[in-house]
Amino acid sequence: MPKSNLEIIRSTYEGSASSNAKHLEEALSEKVEWTEAEGFPYGGTYIGVEAIMENVFSRLGSEWDDYKASVNMYHEVNGKDVIIAEGVYSGGYKETGKLFEADFVHVWQLENGKIVKFKQYVDSYIVREAMKV
């Protein structure tokens, strides 16, 4: 039986970092549109898995220690292929050693069991403060 949209999105947050990444890559559509919030260090819209991995996830992995996105609540939008995740980012910026916690909301749009669009909302000021020397 195919996974529900909620199960697909939960699988990208609730395992180990490596299993979350594997599940995310499997769930992304070929031409997924991924938008990081304006003001966030990696802000912008990226099209396709390669662009997302290069501009977002490789940087998160190389520039931060123990960077996490912990979800507190999921919302499934009835009649739409949309899942909303509310949670908290945390981690330490390697260059400064500063730790942070910042609230986020992620909006996921799916089609036929694949993620076609992602949009991030976050208090980017807190993240940028952790990056300041």
Regions found by a protein language model. Name each.
Residues N5-L6, P41, S90:
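A short, structure-level motif marking secondary-structure boundaries and short turns
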Residues Y13-L24, V49, Y67-N72, G91-G92:
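Phosphate-binding glycine-rich loops and adjacent basic patches that engage nucleotide phosphates
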